[in-house]
Amino acid sequence: MHIGVAATPDVAIPTLDWLISSEHKVDLVITQPDKPAGRGRALKQSVVGEWATARDIPVLKPVTSDELIGKINDLDCVVTIGYGVLLPQHILDLPKFGFINLHFSLLPAYRGAAPAQRALQNGEVTTGVSVFQLEKGMDTGPIYAQRTVS
């Protein structure tokens, strides 16, 4: 399969490493635009952007979701991991199999950002991960797999 990955934080790196070692081809990485960092406030790309650049994988840093049109249409799917942007349905429908998300909670619990942190703050002793089809809502769509972690 030809896949894209939409991710920003370093928590995505182990999954990216696994994907490039699999039989699938990572054709494109989508990440957040560069942001000011450090004392000099110089623009710095995300950890995921650095990871992709080091492996000669094309990186796209769209400011608007419509910048993805024409860039992801030929992909079989896009895997998202902490990308941080709610995408409209017309974008989610572009790849052949849509967007598949890896989310760090047992959905429907803890939809949205920082689910593992919120579970810990609430004293949960069991949480997990979910793999599901992205739809236009916040972490909605059919769940394909879940794994519990205690």
Stretch-by-stretch model annotation:
Residues 1-150:
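One-carbon transfer enzymes
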